[in-house]
Amino acid sequence: MMISSMLFLGMVMFNNVMAQTADELRQKREKDRVEKSLKQACDDDDQYMAEIGYATSADRDDAEASALLNCQRKLKLRLEQTVKGVVEDLAAKQELVSQDAYDAITLRKINQGFQSVINKSVSRTIKCYSDSWKNDKGQYEAEYNAKISVDEFIRETKAGIKEDAVLRANIQMDNFEKEFREHLKNND
């Protein structure tokens, strides 16, 4: 009886160890997947920042203009991609809100607001990056100016939407702001 109990206990312990090992392997695979994804993102950002550094170098006047334009194009594209999903999501949720509170005009205003913040942030951020070689505070100014653009956009857009639509749009705007700040953080 005692031997069978010990065998049973041994089997239970063995099964627990195997289950734990399988779980650890799953966690490791997920961790590796995430790290690989992050590494790719970091490599992309390193290349992106290398181009910005190249563009802002004081002794490369001939190449500066074209490299800076390329950086500006990339920054604008990134922001537009971030915004595109948010605008589409807002449009998809239109049916959840009363038509008079959240109509096509409102959606158009939101889209225009996003384009406005993109244009303001790109021009301000690029200017500060291009000046950073002669001003150590250039990148901080870029982030500050981009923050102003985001804050202006959120304030202006919220003011133009009726209250019940604002409540539904808040999460989307907060997500946009978070992603925008994360973009700045990864590129400062």
What is each model feature region?
Residues M1-M18:
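Classical Sec-dependent N-terminal signal peptides that target proteins to the secretory pathway
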Residues V17-D188:
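Domain-level marker for long, solvent-exposed, non-transmembrane regions
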